[in-house]
């Protein structure tokens, strides 16, 4: 009998997770079934409980339920605790549920392994201060960047995310003029509406990397902006999606799948 996994969200029909995990399973020879699971916005816990009570082994969690999954989990990884959100739930032998957040490690693996970008000693700018930014900040700080700046339209939110961490400076977009960054990561969802944060034209240092957590068939406005201003490496978030899924797969199965073939297949729409 196949092991049972799912991704839960609302909406959920667009999710690529079933394709990704089905490819991982074929690669490692795992017998599993993975499907999409829709839940009403205020009913995450009952849906998750029913899934696990029915023999489910693990859940991926996407918007808007990462906070609810954090509350649902009985035990948490350090990175989930730092993010205040969970995107991976695992059923434990004693009936409890372990919660992890694989977004940050997924971003790091895409940057480092797939694009050869080392964050150590780099000047890093994080655009946005919402859940996506919080989900990756812990792992980014662990790479010892030289400077970390969080810029957001609402400065209070950036300051709240920075907290008392002396390694981080919080500010609005309007005070970035005259600064240069070697790595700029856009965590806002502006690209989904064909928009981007208001940024000065001279923001990118020579040889800069620009990374948008949004993924699409074409360049997002932020990616197009970065290319036009000389960024050497410009990436969307598809690689991060696959890499965070691989970490979830490892949490469930104890085997780490190859990711490059899956990223390539998704790029060409296979």
From Swiss-Prot:
Pathway: Metabolic intermediate biosynthesis; chorismate biosynthesis; chorismate from D-erythrose 4-phosphate and phosphoenolpyruvate: step 4/7. One of its GO terms (molecular function) is shikimate 3-dehydrogenase (NADP+) activity. The keyword Oxidoreductase applies. Keywords: Amino-acid biosynthesis, Aromatic amino acid biosynthesis, NADP, Oxidoreductase. InterPro entries: Aminoacid_DH-like_N_sf (IPR046346), NAD(P)-bd_dom_sf (IPR036291), SDH_C (IPR041121), Shikimate_DH (IPR011342), Shikimate_DH-bd_N (IPR013708), Shikimate_DH_fam (IPR022893), Shikm_DH/Glu-tRNA_Rdtase (IPR006151). Disulfide bonds: none annotated. The active site is at 66 (proton acceptor). GO terms for biological process: amino acid biosynthetic process; aromatic amino acid family biosynthetic process; chorismate biosynthetic process; shikimate metabolic process. Shikimate binds at residues 15-17, 62, 87, 103, 215. It catalyses: shikimate + NADP(+) = 3-dehydroshikimate + NADPH + H(+). NADP(+) binds at residues 78, 128-132, 152-157, 213, 237. GO terms for cellular component: cytosol. Its EC number is 1.1.1.25. It holds the Pfam family Shikimate_dh_N. Involved in the biosynthesis of the chorismate, which leads to the biosynthesis of aromatic amino acids. Catalyzes the reversible NADPH linked reduction of 3-dehydroshikimate (DHSA) to yield shikimate (SA). Belongs to the shikimate dehydrogenase family. HAMAP family: Shikimate_DH_AroE (MF_00222). Homodimer. This is Shikimate dehydrogenase (NADP(+)).
């Amino acid at each position: 009998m196949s092991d049972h996994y799912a991704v839960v969200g609302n909406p959920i029909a667009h999710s690529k997770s079933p394709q990704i995990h089905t490819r991982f399973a074929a690669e490692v020879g795992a017998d599993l079934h993975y499907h999409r699971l829709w839940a009403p916005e205020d009913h995450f816990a009952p849906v998750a409980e029913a899934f696990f009570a029915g023999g489910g082994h693990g859940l991926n969690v996407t918007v808007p339920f990462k906070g609810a999954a954090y509350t649902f989990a009985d035990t948490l990884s350090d990175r989930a605790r730092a993010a205040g959100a969970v995107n991976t739930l695992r059923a434990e032998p004693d009936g409890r549920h372990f919660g992890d957040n694989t977004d940050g490690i997924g971003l790091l693996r895409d940057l480092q392994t797939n694009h050869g970008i080392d964050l150590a000693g780099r000047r890093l700018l994080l655009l946005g201060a919402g859940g996506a930014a919080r989900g990756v900040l812990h792992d980014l700080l662990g790479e010892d960047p030289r400077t970390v700046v969080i810029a957001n339209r609402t400065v209070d939110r950036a300051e709240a995310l920075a907290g008392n961490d002396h390694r981080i400076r919080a500010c609005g977009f309007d005070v970035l003029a005259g600064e240069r960054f070697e790595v700029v990561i856009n965590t806002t969802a502006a690209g989904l509406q064909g928009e981007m944060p208001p940024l000065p034209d001279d923001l990118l240092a020579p040889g800069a990397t620009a990374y948008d957590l949004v993924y699409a068939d074409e360049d997002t406005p932020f990616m197009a902006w970065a290319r036009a201003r000389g960024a050497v490496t410009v990436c969307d978030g598809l690689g991060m999606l696959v890499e965070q899924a691989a970490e979830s797969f490892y949490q469930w199965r104890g085997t780490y799948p190859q990711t490059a073939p899956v990223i390539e297949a998704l790029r060409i729409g296979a």
